[in-house]
From Swiss-Prot:
One CC-aspect GO term: COP9 signalosome
Protein name stated in the entry: COP9 signalosome complex subunit 7b
Main location (coarse class): cytoplasm
Function: Component of the COP9 signalosome complex (CSN), a complex involved in various cellular and developmental processes. The CSN complex is an essential regulator of the ubiquitin (Ubl) conjugation pathway by mediating the deneddylation of the cullin subunits of SCF-type E3 ligase complexes, leading to decrease the Ubl ligase activity of SCF-type complexes such as SCF, CSA or DDB2. The complex is also involved in phosphorylation of p53/TP53, JUN, I-kappa-B-alpha/NFKBIA, ITPK1 and IRF8/ICSBP, possibly via its association with CK2 and PKD kinases.
Amino acid composition bias (Basic and acidic residues), ranges on this chain: 235-248
Upper taxonomic lineage: Eukaryota, Metazoa, Chordata, Craniata, Vertebrata
Domain PCI: 2-159
Alphabetical keyword list: Acetylation, Coiled coil, Cytoplasm, Nucleus, Signalosome
Polar residues: compositionally biased ranges: 223-232
Amino acid sequence: MAGEQKPSSNLLEQFILLAKGTSGSALTALISQVLEAPGVYVFGELLELANVQELAEGANAAYLQLLNLFAYGTYPDYIANKESLPELSTAQQNKLKHLTIVSLASRMKCIPYSVLLKDLEMRNLRELEDLIIEAVYTDIIQGKLDQRNQLLEVDFCIGRDIRKKDINNIVKTLHEWCDGCEAVLLGIEQQVLRANQYKENHSRTQQQVEAEVTNIKKTLKATASSSAQEMEQQLAERECPPHAEQRQPTKKMSKVKGLVSSRH
């Protein structure tokens, strides 16, 4: 795309160089050529030339008005002032319609066919779509045609020339955009902090749970070991009675024997 725009930029520079040494009818003819030239869609540098501005004082003031219209205006503006402006050639008319599409695209991302037909003063949908396709091929807009819903969906459009009086509004818009970006950034930072805090809390809780599980396992293991020892001891006591209980009958027998002996 950049490669396609370079020849147009060079062409505009050539027109500007030619215009610097031109005046009168030669200058108006040059302006007409610029307005017809393929790929040339910005005219601010040409408008800033002193000899071009001098046209406002003479009989060719209408050409300066027409150049201003191509720089900042739209096709409806031309129709509204048609009586005081030079007649457009077919190429100039198509270019001004292209610029009108760009102006609409800068305000709306989905442009209804009905709006385009009205502003471009067209009745035939096929001709409208052909005009849009021409604008796409010249790289002044990018988008697609939604024929089912009769919309032009815009992805990109070039910037048009800017009036000096509009600069303050542009600066204000940029400041508002920057403020909006800062607000979004602050919101993201707060979400990151919350996410990190949640992660930290979750990690701490997980560690506590793991520690409790480990303690419970140790307790269960110790309890199981103690129970096993008690059971073994009980079994051992049942199988092998204490020696003290086995010796008691022997003592009794000894006493009996003593009594028997004393009687004899």
